[in-house]
Amino acid sequence: MQIQDRFMSPQWKARFKGYVQVTKPGIIFGNLISVAGGFLLAAKGDVNLVLMLASLVGLSLVVASGCAINNCIDRDIDAKMQRTCKRVTVTGEIAVGNVLAFGLALGVLGFSILALFTNALALLFAVIGYIVYVGVYSLYMKRNSVYGTLVGSFSGAVPPVVGYCSVTGQMDMGAAILLLMFSLWQMPHSYAIAIFRFNDYAAANIPVLPVAEGMTKAKLHIVLYIAVFALVSALLPLAGYTGIAFMAVTCATSLWWLAMALKGYRHGVDMQRWARQVFGFSIITITALSVTMALDFQVVSQAPLLTLVK
């Protein structure tokens, strides 16, 4: 009874909630959708449920690990931002050392699952994505360079490629398109956040594009990246990996997103409201494409660009 009372206590519940929050569940959920999309696109209807579950769980734990460690690294700048100033690593509700140990444990477990159940190429992409996010982006680029978003976009594009390569074991044209497509999507998505969170980033002296080089350049980059994203997304059906349904969805969502981005050039536009709309529709776009490519796959024969034997 004493053990049960302990786990039901408000203090324990708050502590448990804090550990969950440092893993950023929203980011994990978004990555789950993209991993599943990449996996099912590659599986082409022949789904190994054990492999799929291992890919989803393993990658989710790796993402959770990266997010937890990012909380530790960013605690000084998080303290300066209204959105993040109440994170447990800032308030001290949970010791930074405990969060770091928790994050490392999640990473070990996640990578172990990927190593045991997937293949060397899927594991390699997960490792590279993790190193880029934690080691390159979080530790240095985010704080010191306007190109931090560009570097971080690679790690954000890794999950669907891990899902895809878990099935194929090779880096073919389909995997390359996914990597480029999701990297391009990250840019306007992130710049939109930087615009409607402008004051936070400025207060923390983080050199995101709107802060470092102005709103005008950020708006232009958003429009250009969405336009290129639309073209790259169309390569999946053009290369025969998906069918007409994916082409219809990618054209509809990408063009609507582009039209929404162009509204940023209207005279007197409310930049905060506009950026939130661009951000919100970016999530709708990538979710719709992930779901559609999982359902509208086509059987193609492609020579691998890279193959690693497990």
Swiss-Prot record:
EC number: 2.5.1.141
Gene Ontology MF annotations: protoheme IX farnesyltransferase activity
Protein's membrane topology: Multi-pass membrane protein
Chain ranges passing through the membrane: 25-45, 49-69, 87-107, 120-139, 145-165, 176-196, 220-240, 242-262, 277-297
Top class in the EC scheme: transferase
Any single Gene Ontology cellular-component annotation: plasma membrane
Taxonomic superkingdom: Bacteria
Catalytic activity: heme b + (2E,6E)-farnesyl diphosphate + H2O = Fe(II)-heme o + diphosphate
A Pfam short name: UbiA
Gene3D superfamilies linked to this entry: UbiA prenyltransferase (1.10.357.140)
Any GO BP: heme O biosynthetic process
The protein's annotated pathway: Porphyrin-containing compound metabolism; heme O biosynthesis; heme O from protoheme: step 1/1
Transmembrane found in the keyword field: yes
Keyword Transmembrane helix annotated: yes
Subcellular location: Cell inner membrane
Keywords of the record: Cell inner membrane, Cell membrane, Heme biosynthesis, Membrane, Transferase, Transmembrane, Transmembrane helix
More info: Carbon 2 of the heme B porphyrin ring is defined according to the Fischer nomenclature.
Assigned protein family: Belongs to the UbiA prenyltransferase family. Protoheme IX farnesyltransferase subfamily.
Function: Converts heme B (protoheme IX) to heme O by substitution of the vinyl group on carbon 2 of heme B porphyrin ring with a hydroxyethyl farnesyl side group.
Name listed for the protein in its UniProt record: Protoheme IX farnesyltransferase 2
Species, as recorded: Shewanella baltica (strain OS185)
Gene: cyoE2
